[in-house]
Amino acid sequence: MTREERMVRDELSALARDDRGRHLLQLSLRGIQESGRGLTYGCWIKPDGGVAGCLFQHAYWQGVAEGVFKPAEHPKGEIKDYIGEEDFAIVMGAIRAFDVLGRRRFTHWRLGPYGLPQRSLDAERWHETVERILIDALAGSRPEGAAQPAPIPTPVP
């Protein structure tokens, strides 16, 4: 795991410790697995069409589909109201961490029209990596106050 991936995982793990934060990440996971929309980094939604979005945009779209969120022009307010001010700061930290990861590890420069450089996201690898980090963060974190697993009894000799 790279340093950038660790930063993203740490932010998501912090969010997953709260029930609503965990639910938001579960919405994100279902959204990126089921929606058929593209997955971006660093922004809520692509400015050129709105058919792709960041992890939390996917959570919003999935939440609207499941009746968790009301349709709104900007999902930021709905998500902030849902998870609260403190956890929303973690969401913003995660978006920044995703931006760093996406730009450093999954973006390649190529020559575009007229020989001008153009950024290109390796979308398939990006999607696979984000999904893996998200699953790892959910699996490795329990909400605060969740019951500890029962200890395994030691056999008596």
Summary of predicted features, one role per range:
Residues M1-P157:
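Short, glycine-biased loop/turn motifs at secondary-structure junctions and
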